[in-house]
Swiss-Prot record:
Molecular functions per Gene Ontology: S-adenosylmethionine-dependent methyltransferase activity
UniProt name for this protein: O-methyltransferase rstn1
Pathway(s) served: Antifungal biosynthesis
Chain sites annotated for binding S-adenosyl-L-methionine: 97, 142
Keyword annotations from UniProtKB, A to Z: Methyltransferase, S-adenosyl-L-methionine, Transferase
Organism: Aspergillus nomiae NRRL (strain ATCC 15546 / NRRL 13137 / CBS 260.88 / M93)
PANTHER family, A to Z: GERANYL DIPHOSPHATE 2-C-METHYLTRANSFERASE, ZGC:194242
Gene this protein is translated from: rstn1
Chain segments annotated as transmembrane: none
Class in the EC hierarchy, top level: transferase
Role of this protein: O-methyltransferase; part of the gene cluster that mediates the biosynthesis of the tetrahydropyranyl antifungal agent restricticin that acts as an inhibitor of CYP51 and blocks the ergosterol biosynthesis. Within the pathway, rstn1 uses S-adenosylmethionine to methylate position C4 of desmethylrestrictinol to produce restrictinol. The highly reducing polyketide synthase rstn3, the short chain dehydrogenase rstn4, the cyclase rstn5, the FAD-dependent monooxygenase rstn6 and the enoylreductase rstn7 are required to generate the first stable intermediate desmethylrestrictinol.
Length: 225
């Protein structure tokens, strides 16, 4: 792979690996959140908890329109839409994920509550100020132009809307460069920003960071939202 994978390359990777990843992650495609080290929760409970944390940070109101940037199979969208009674549009660059999301969830939830489209966050097909909130769960990590993606997300959000992100970033000093290189190659990941770089980029694209929580010790991975 190149150091800057295209959306097509990322989509092809997920076409190949989505079924395997969802088998491991209890239907989701993101790490879990074990908030109590004394409690031995299952991966299903932990991944649902991470999704719930994201949904709660949106502070959404019933009936609002929310954008899911990198919706995977749609399971997170359904969980958040059901819990908060909002309408969610999910996008992905994987044809296989769109097929799964539409067949498994779109027709089995309240009419109009969730819908899924093939779309690239770096070229969103929505009008300005179309959504009341947005979230991205481990999807920005794949994008070769995060600045453009965040600028596009800001464009389609109404003033005052929230963006909740759960993602990976790289601390200074990689302990195992070979493992990291393999991760980049296998999962089509361009160079990752540091936490400070990500916060700076959010500010530069029009967002105000109101919370930054490090959950690496409770995720089984160096993951942060």
């Amino acid at each position: 792979m190149s150091l800057q994978p295209t959306a097509t390359e990322v989509g092809t990777m997920y076409d190949q690996y989505t079924s395997l990843l969802t088998d491991v992650m209890a239907g989701f495609i993101h790490v879990g959140y074990w908030d109590d080290p004394e409690r031995e929760d299952t991966i299903e409970v932990a991944t649902e908890r991470l999704t719930r944390e994201i949904g709660e940070r949106l502070s959404s109101v019933r009936g609002q329109r929310i954008l899911d940037v990198g919706c995977g199979t749609g399971k997170s969208a359904v969980q958040i839409a059901t819990a908060h009674d909002v309408h969610i549009t999910g996008i992905t660059v994987s044809n296989h994920q769109i097929e799964l999301a539409q067949s498994q969830y779109e027709s089995n939830t309240k009419a109009g509550q969730v819908n899924f489209l093939f779309a690239n966050a770096m070229d969103l097909p929505f009008a300005d100020a179309s959504f009341d909130g947005a979230y991205a769960i481990e999807s920005l990590v794949h994008m070769d132009d995060r600045r453009t993606a965040l600028t596009n997300i800001a464009r389609v959000l109404r003033p005052g809307s929230r963006l909740a992100i759960a993602d990976l970033f790289l601390d200074a000093g990689c302990p195992n460069p070979e493992v990291l290189a393999r991760f980049h190659e296998l999962f089509q990941v361009p160079p990752m920003p540091s936490g400070d770089d990500l916060k700076a980029l959010l500010h530069q694209t029009g967002f105000k960071v109101i919370e930054f929580t490090d959950i690496r010790d409770t995720s089984g991975l160096s993951a942060n939202f």
